[in-house]
C-alpha cells in the first residue's frame, strides 16, 4: 500500500467523519487499492458504524483504545500503519479538490520523503 490516512476519532459520529471519507472516495486518477485509512477511537463511547466503515472502495481499519488524548491516539494510528507514506487528518477535515491525492501521488513518485500542504478553513479561505 502506498498511502495510509490516519484519523484520530473521539466523539465524532458517522455524520461528522463521513464528508472526509466521501472526499477520499471521490479522488480521481488514483488506484483506490493504493490507499488505506486507519481510524483510532480515543476511548469514546461513540463508535463508527460498520455500515459506514464498509461502504468505501478503499480499505478502512478501525481500532478502539483507551482515552489518552489526540496525540497518543495519532501515535496509536501510526503503530498500525504499514504504508510507504502516511497522512494525518482530523475527523472533521475533507479534501477540497478531487485531484488532491493525485497531486500527492505525483510528488511521491518523484521521491520526496515528506510533503506539506495548505489547508482551507471552513469558510473556504486559505
Q: Residue ranges of each PLM-predicted region?
A:
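Glycine-rich, basic loop-to-helix element that forms the pyrophosphate-binding segment
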Residues: 65-81
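Cell-envelope/extracellular polymer assembly enzymes that use nucleotide-activated donors
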Residues: 2-4, 36
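Short aromatic/hydrophobic "clamp" motif used to bind/position activated sugar donors
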Residues: 86
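Short beta-strand/loop segment that forms part of the nucleotide-sugar
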Residues: 33-44, 61-66
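A conserved acidic beta->alpha catalytic loop
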Residues: 39-50, 90
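Short, acidic/glycine-rich phosphate-metal binding loop used to engage nucleotide
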Residues: 11, 63-70, 94
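Short, well-formed alpha-helical segments that are part of the catalytic scaffolds
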Residues: 12-28
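Conserved donor NDP-sugar-binding/catalytic core segment of glycosyltransferases
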Residues: 94, 98-126
Amino acid at each position: 500500500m502506498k498511502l495510509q490516512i490516519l484519523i484520530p476519532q473521539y466523539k465524532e459520529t458517522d455524520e461528522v467523519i463521513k464528508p472526509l471519507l466521501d472526499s477520499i472516495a471521490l479522488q480521481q486518477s488514483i488506484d483506490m487499492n493504493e490507499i488505506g485509512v486507519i481510524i483510532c477511537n480515543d476511548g469514546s463511547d461513540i463508535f463508527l458504524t460498520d455500515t459506514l466503515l464498509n461502504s468505501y472502495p478503499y480499505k478502512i481499519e478501525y481500532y478502539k483504545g483507551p482515552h489518552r488524548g489526540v496525540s497518543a491516539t495519532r501515535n496509536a494510528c501510526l503503530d498500525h500503519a504499514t504504508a510507504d507514506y502516511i497522512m494525518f487528518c482530523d475527523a472533521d477535515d475533507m479534501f477540497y479538490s478531487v485531484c488532491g491525492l493525485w497531486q500527492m501521488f505525483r510528488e511521491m513518485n518523484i521521491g520526496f520523503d515528506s510533503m506539506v500542504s495548505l489547508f482551507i478553513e471552513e469558510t473556504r479561505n486559505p
